[in-house]
């Protein structure tokens, strides 16, 4: 088999066989196939697309390029949730203990975040003593005993994906549906999930800006999952404004605790219940979505979700007292109110830009080496569709420096007030095939 023949075949719009895709991934991962041939094939895929079989074959070739986590010793159906990322996306922190409280095993492997705020692990590490450096054996034991545990990403998972992603980044082939879908799904499958719930974001704060693109990506990932024996479904949710009200690590953790207490923001609560219901059904803990939602609501109302969160923190060395006293979480020195310059209705809160503003305060990382300030961030006091009076506080800036003129300038560009505006749709579509 020759790489040049594979490139020409895809260039001419023909389908590649499973063997050809495996030959490419294996050869590229071990260094036999040079970057220039790999980037040529990536560009051919970018223009000619791939069918469902090719996408599934590419995904599994990347899964098999490295270690695969074996979670078979964990009882029950392991359902993993993946979000394509957004601003103020606190869902994992609420979802994990909530679905665990109704018996769904959550074996979560999480990374550190690059971008607007930290990843799930960074947020949890704003709790004193909490750690994710646990052995695989302890991880499995904790999930069997308490239904939920989080471990840091370790081992050599999907090395082919890491190598191909770095190449796509510099060759103009990032925005290709088959390449994005196989990249995301290979990581989830290698991490041992039996079933997968995807939260595909759309809007200005998302990777997929239009509903059409988000739908295409969701269909691609669901089809890959179902083709390789992993029950998969996707929800397309809105990210034109930040989710919830908090953007920042400790601030989002506090919001997660409020939500588990039944006092969270409406949109975050709704998204968590929608995603959670799907997870409960996929794990066979309920027959219908209505029944699943009822179980989740009960777990919030009777306090079992919050109890589950406490046990989870305790199991991993975290100081549980913060759950009852969130003021013990890292707190910024200055709280600065950002006030409305006119009266009207909030018509735009550009998620992306607000994320950048929060990063300027130190809430996120630009490079892997950056230190995150866990205490800083932004809390929205108004959301799109809310009425506001001139001089009223739109949001609160939590900062460890007194001068935040640069952040205010950024916020000026990301907020609009008009005579009228409507609240955006939160959940656009649910995709099961």
From Swiss-Prot:
Cofactor section: K(+)
Enzyme Commission designation: 2.4.2.2
Highest taxon above the source species: Bacteria
InterPro entries in the cross-refs: Glycosyl_Trfase_fam3, Glycosyl_Trfase_fam3_N_dom, Glycosyl_Trfase_fam3_N_dom_sf, Nuc_phospho_transferase, PYNP-like_C_sf, PYNP_C, Pyrmidine_PPas_bac/euk, Pyrmidine_PPase_CS
Matching SMART domains: PYNP_C
Gene Ontology MF terms in the entry: 1,4-alpha-oligoglucan phosphorylase activity; deoxyuridine phosphorylase activity; metal ion binding; thymidine phosphorylase activity; uridine phosphorylase activity
Keyword Transferase: yes
Gene Ontology biological process terms, A to Z: pyrimidine nucleobase metabolic process; pyrimidine nucleoside metabolic process
Catalytic activity: uridine + phosphate = alpha-D-ribose 1-phosphate + uracil; thymidine + phosphate = 2-deoxy-alpha-D-ribose 1-phosphate + thymine; 2'-deoxyuridine + phosphate = 2-deoxy-alpha-D-ribose 1-phosphate + uracil
Positions with a binding annotation for phosphate: 81-83, 92, 108-110, 120
Free-text cofactor note: Binds 1 K(+) ion per subunit.
Annotated binding of K(+), by residue: 88, 90, 243, 246, 255
One Gene Ontology cellular component annotation held by this UniProt entry: cytosol
Keyword terms, alphabetized: Glycosyltransferase, Metal-binding, Potassium, Transferase
Pfam families associated with the record: Glycos_trans_3N, Glycos_transf_3, PYNP_C
EC class of the enzyme, as a word: transferase
Chain positions recorded as substrate binding sites: 168, 187
Family: Belongs to the thymidine/pyrimidine-nucleoside phosphorylase family.
Complex formation: Homodimer.
Function: Catalyzes phosphorolysis of the pyrimidine nucleosides uridine, thymidine and 2'-deoxyuridine with the formation of the corresponding pyrimidine base and ribose-1-phosphate.
Protein name: Pyrimidine-nucleoside phosphorylase
Lineage: Bacteria, Bacillati, Bacillota, Bacilli, Bacillales
Name of encoding gene: pdp
């Amino acid at each position: 088999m020759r790489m040049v023949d594979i490139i020409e075949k895809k260039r001419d719009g023909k389908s590649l066989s499973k063997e050809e895709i495996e030959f490419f991934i294996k050869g590229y991962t071990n260094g036999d196939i040079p970057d220039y041939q790999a980037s040529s094939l990536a560009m051919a895929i970018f223009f000619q697309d791939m069918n469902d079989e090719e996408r599934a074959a590419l995904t599994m070739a990347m899964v098999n390029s490295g270690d695969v986590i074996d979670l078979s010793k964990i009882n029950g159906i392991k359902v993993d949730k993946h979000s394509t990322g957004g601003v103020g996306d606190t869902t994992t922190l609420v979802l994990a203990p909530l679905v665990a409280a109704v018996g769904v095993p959550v074996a979560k492997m999480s990374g550190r975040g690059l971008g607007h705020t930290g990843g799930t692990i960074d947020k949890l590490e704003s709790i004193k003593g909490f750690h994710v450096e646990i052995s695989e054996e302890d991880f499995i034991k904790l999930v069997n005993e308490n239904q939920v545990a989080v471990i840091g990403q370790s081992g050599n998972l999907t090395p082919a994906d890491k190598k191909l992603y770095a190449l796509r980044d510099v060759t103009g082939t990032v925005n290709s549906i088959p390449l994005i879908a196989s990249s995301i799904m290979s990581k989830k499958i290698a991490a041992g999930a039996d079933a997968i719930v995807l939260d595909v974001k759309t809007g200005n704060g998302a990777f997929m800006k239009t509903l059409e693109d988000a739908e295409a990506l969701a269909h691609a990932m669901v089809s890959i999952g179902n083709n390789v024996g992993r029950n998969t479904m996707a929800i397309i949710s809105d990210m034109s404004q930040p989710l919830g009200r908090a953007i920042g690590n400790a601030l989002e953790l506090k919001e997660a605790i409020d939500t588990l207490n039944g006092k969270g923001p409406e949109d975050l609560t709704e998204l968590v219940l929608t995603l959670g219901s799907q997870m409960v059904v996929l794990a066979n803990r309920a027959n219908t979505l209505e029944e699943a939602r009822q179980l989740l609501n009960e777990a919030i109302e009777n306090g079992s979700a919050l109890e589950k969160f406490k046990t989870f923190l305790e199991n991993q060395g975290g100081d549980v007292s913060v759950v009852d006293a969130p003021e013990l979480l890292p707190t910024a020195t200055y709280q600065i109110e950002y006030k409305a310059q006119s009266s009207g209705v909030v018509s735009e809160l550009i998620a992306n830009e607000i994320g950048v503003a929060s990063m300027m305060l130190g809430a996120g990382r630009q490079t892997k080496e950056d230190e995150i300030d866990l205490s800083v961030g932004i809390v929205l006091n108004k959301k799109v569709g809310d009425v506001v009076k001139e001089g009223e506080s739109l949001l609160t800036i939590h900062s460890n420096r007194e001068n935040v003129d640069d952040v205010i300038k950024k916020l000026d560009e990301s907020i609009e007030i008009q005579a009228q505006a409507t609240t955006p749709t939160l959940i656009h579509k649910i995709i099961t095939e």
